[in-house]
Design a protein with these regions (language model features):
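Cell-envelope/extracellular polymer assembly enzymes that use nucleotide-activated donors
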Residues: 1-3, 32
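Short, well-formed alpha-helical segments that are part of the catalytic scaffolds
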Residues: 11-25
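Donor nucleotide-sugar binding loop of glycosyltransferases
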Residues: 11-14, 40, 62
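A conserved acidic beta->alpha catalytic loop
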Residues: 21, 37-45, 85
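Conserved donor nucleotide-binding strand/loop of the catalytic core
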Residues: 31, 45-72
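Acidic donor-binding/catalytic loop of UDP-sugar-dependent glycosyltransferases
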Residues: 43, 83-97
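Catalytic metal- and UDP-sugar-binding loop of GT-A-like glycosyltransferases, i.e.
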Residues: 58, 81-83
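Short aromatic/hydrophobic "clamp" motif used to bind/position activated sugar donors
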Residues: 78
Length: 98
């Protein structure tokens, strides 16, 4: 399984497109999605609530957020994405195969 870790802060405008795209893999149980919020003041977490497996809240800092997400990840492959990074299903599955 792939664990996709997405550190965010105030990404309400970007997050839904990315998360909606990842739902096919999530439905196949090929990935888990971990959103790590670094203090958003917009509705980022509300938008993501039903589209991710975990929402964690922590202090701001990409490295801190990534490490917190990695600490609960269940996958044997970790993929770190930005909220506005779009990766195809084929690309993700090729990472899993390597």
């Amino acid at each position: 399984m792939i664990s996709i870790i997405i550190p965010v802060r105030n990404e309400a405008q970007n997050i839904s497109k990315n998360l909606n795209h990842l739902q096919e893999l999530r439905r196949r149980n090929s990935c888990e999605i971990i959103l790590v919020d670094g203090g958003s003041t917009d509705n980022t977490t509300e938008i993501a609530n039903n589209l991710v497996d975990h929402i964690l809240k922590t202090k701001l800092g990409r490295a801190v957020q990534q490490n917190i997400g990695a600490s609960i990840a269940k996958g044997n492959t970790l993929v770190f994405l930005h909220a506005d990074t779009y990766i195809t299903t084929k690309q993700l599955l090729s990472i899993k195969e390597d």
